[in-house]
């Protein structure tokens, strides 16, 4: 199968990291990018230099109407309205919607007017079906024009929750994500009328925050609906976050038995999605890791055979962006069979 031709709307944090990931993804070919706020010369600069993930290793040339990256032309558009982006011109029939603005089905569907066939929103959506690779992607049947790749935290949590629930049955669970700061936070204290704590400087504080990531697991694993909720602690790190999952299980098991089940899944059906480590890792060790979830065997604890705390890392930028591309390629394969 030929690589899936993809367009990106929004060349911000996730848009650029999706692009970088695509260079390593043989099944994806980025052919077009749209961003009304970034000129091509600036786009080249932002792609080349990244404070968190380092300098781009490939060749970038600025053209009159786009970029040439590693010898391949990428068309650039500057349309504010998704309906006006001529995706068909570049045969970009699959689009990553990464502006963070057009996250509903109705808004994201505007891409179809320009020739896109399918849109993957790189964020949770209020109404678009959500898919998490390794968890419920096989339920995709090609009918939806707009789908969501859920959130980075849901992508970390859901594979782990699936393994535990499949083997031991989850009765109830609470999650905390210790999450790196993101672009929505403040460099210094500033006004934030809807979230007072969120207006405090990200660089100096641990900031309690809400997250819908745990509840979203109930959408991709229906049997966990109502059994799982969670919160977030925003911390002063640039990338790599960690899920702390405290779970009560029906089938009694020692922590060692639970570890073995997770290890088996990581080396089997969830290989490439879920990883397993017994190393003494810290957050920066996962910078640039492609996995959705890296289970830390040494960090977890159990109170008894029915009550356990599990810890799993994720690069909330890099690993998530890789799953966006994996989902795009997966749905294109399903679509091509129909």
UniProtKB/Swiss-Prot annotation:
Gene3D superfamilies per the UniProt record, alphabetical: Dihydrodipicolinate Reductase, domain 2 (3.30.360.10), NAD(P)-binding Rossmann-like Domain (3.40.50.720)
GO biological process, one term: glycolytic process
Lineage: Eukaryota, Fungi, Dikarya, Ascomycota, Pezizomycotina
Keyword Oxidoreductase belongs to the record: yes
Positions of disulphide bridges: none
EC identifiers of the protein: 1.2.1.12
UniProt catalytic activity: D-glyceraldehyde 3-phosphate + phosphate + NAD(+) = (2R)-3-phospho-glyceroyl phosphate + NADH + H(+)
Domain of life (superkingdom): Eukaryota
Top EC class, one word: oxidoreductase
Pathway given in the UniProt record: Carbohydrate degradation; glycolysis; pyruvate from D-glyceraldehyde 3-phosphate: step 1/5
Active site per UniProt: 152 (nucleophile)
Residues binding NAD(+), per UniProt: 13-14, 35, 80, 316
Record-listed D-glyceraldehyde 3-phosphate binding positions: 151-153, 182, 211-212, 234
Naturally occurring in which organism (per UniProt): Sclerotinia sclerotiorum (White mold)
Cellular component, GO, one term: cytosol
InterPro entries: GlycerAld/Erythrose_P_DH, GlycerAld_3-P_DH_AS, GlycerAld_3-P_DH_cat, GlycerAld_3-P_DH_NAD(P)-bd, Glyceraldehyde-3-P_DH_1, NAD(P)-bd_dom_sf
Name of the protein described by the UniProt record: Glyceraldehyde-3-phosphate dehydrogenase
Annotated keywords: Cytoplasm, Glycolysis, NAD, Oxidoreductase
UniProt-recorded Gene Ontology molecular function terms: glyceraldehyde-3-phosphate dehydrogenase (NAD+) (phosphorylating) activity; NAD binding; NADP binding
Family as reported in the entry's similarity comment: Belongs to the glyceraldehyde-3-phosphate dehydrogenase family.
Entry-linked Pfam families: Gp_dh_C, Gp_dh_N
Site location (Activates thiol group during catalysis): 179
Transmembrane spans: none
